[in-house]
Amino acid sequence: MFTTHPQGRSYRSSVPHHHLRQPEIQNSYDQHANNPPRQTRRRPLADMIGHPIHFLTGQFAGQTIRAELDEIQKADLGRKYARVDRRPLDPPPVVRLRYFDIREDDVDQERGTEIKNYDEIQTIGLMSTVDLFPVPNESWTSRSPTQTSFSSSSPTLSNGNENFMFSSPQTSSPTAAQSQASTPNSPSSNDIIHYVGNHAITESSKVTSSLVGATFVQPAIVDYEGKKTIIFVFSDLAVKIEGTFLLRYRVFDIYSRPRDREDLLVQAECYGGPFRVYSTKEFPGLQASTDLTKHLARWGVRLNIRETERKRRKKGEIGSPLDDPKSKRKRTSLGSEDDEASDED
C-alpha cells in the first residue's frame, strides 16, 4: 500500500496491508486526500538526452523537439601534447547535429520529422563539448553497435563562473558484455556509459582534464550531402597523455530551457570512434587532409589543410617530405598562419 513520506512524497510501504491497524490505514488515506500525488512525473534529466523535449524558452519555445548527434569524421591519431610543439588530433573530429519536430499527428512520436531548412536555425547559443575516455587497444579491433539507455547521474561541468548541470547516459551492452559486467571485478552497471566491443566505458574513467585546446566549440552551417547541415568541428584539440581514447560529444543551447526545468539541458550526445595518441618518437606522421576537411575549409571553417602526406623525419634522413613546401600545412584565408614546426626528434 501507499504511505506518505514526511516531506509529502508517497512511497510503497513494505508492511503488508493486513498488518496495519485500521486507524493507520485511515490516516494514510486521509493524508493522501489532503496531499494528492502529482499527476505528471518529471523525467530525470538524463532520460531526456536524445528524447523529445518540450521547450518553454528559446528558439523552440512551445515545440517538442528531439536532437540527434552523430560523428561524421573521427580522429585517427594525435601526438602527445608538448608546449613547444602542439599538434591537434588529426583529422579534426566533426559531429553533425540534427533536429526532429515532434507533432501530435506524427505516427512515430519518438522520432518525429527532421527539420528541413537548417538555415532558419539560430546557432547563437548552441555549443558542443567533449569528454575523453581511455580505450584498451584490443577492445576496438572489431566494434559492435550498442544501444543507449540513460542513468540519473548529473555531473556538473564548469565554464567560467557558471555551472551547467549535464546528465550522464548509461549504455546497454550486448549479452556477452552484460554477463561480463556482472562479474565481481567488473565496473558497476551504474557507472557504465558505453561499450566498445565487449569493453565497458565508465564515467569514472573519464580523463577530460588531459585534453588541451578548444573543448567547447560553436557550430557552423555548411552544405553536406546535398543539404545545409549544422556541424561542430574540433580543430584545436590535443591530448597530454599517450594511449587509445574516444570522445564523447554533447550539445546544448544556453538560451533554451525545457518545461518545468531550470537546468541547462544536454539535448543530445554521441560517442566517437577510437584514436591513438603517440609519443613524439613513435608518431608516424600525418596523412593528407581528408575530402571532408577540405570541403569544410571551402565553406569557411577554420582548419589546417595538407595537400600531401607528412611523414615523420628521422635523424640523418635527407629528402624528407617535410622539405617539400607543398607538404606544409596551411590555414584557410579565414585563419592565421599554421605552426610550421618540424616533426624532427
From Swiss-Prot:
Keywords: Nucleus, Sporulation, Transcription, Transcription regulation
A single Gene Ontology CC term: nucleus
Pfam family, one: Velvet
Domain of life per record: Eukaryota
Amino acid composition bias (Polar residues), ranges on this chain: 1-13, 24-38
Chain segments carrying region Disordered: 1-43, 138-189, 310-345
Domain Velvet stretches: 62-306
PROSITE patterns: VELVET
GO terms classed as biological process: sporulation resulting in formation of a cellular spore
Induction: Expression is up-regulated during fruiting body formation.
Subcellular location: Nucleus
Positions with biased composition (Acidic residues): 336-345
Location, primary (coarse class): nucleus
Bias type Low complexity, positions: 141-158, 167-184
Cited function: Velvet-domain-containing protein that probably acts as a positive regulator of sexual development.
Family: Belongs to the velvet family.
PANTHER family given in the database record: SPORE DEVELOPMENT REGULATOR VOSA, VELVET COMPLEX SUBUNIT B
Name of the protein in its database record: Probable velvet family sexual development regulator LACBIDRAFT_317102
Source organism (scientific name): Laccaria bicolor (strain S238N-H82 / ATCC MYA-4686)
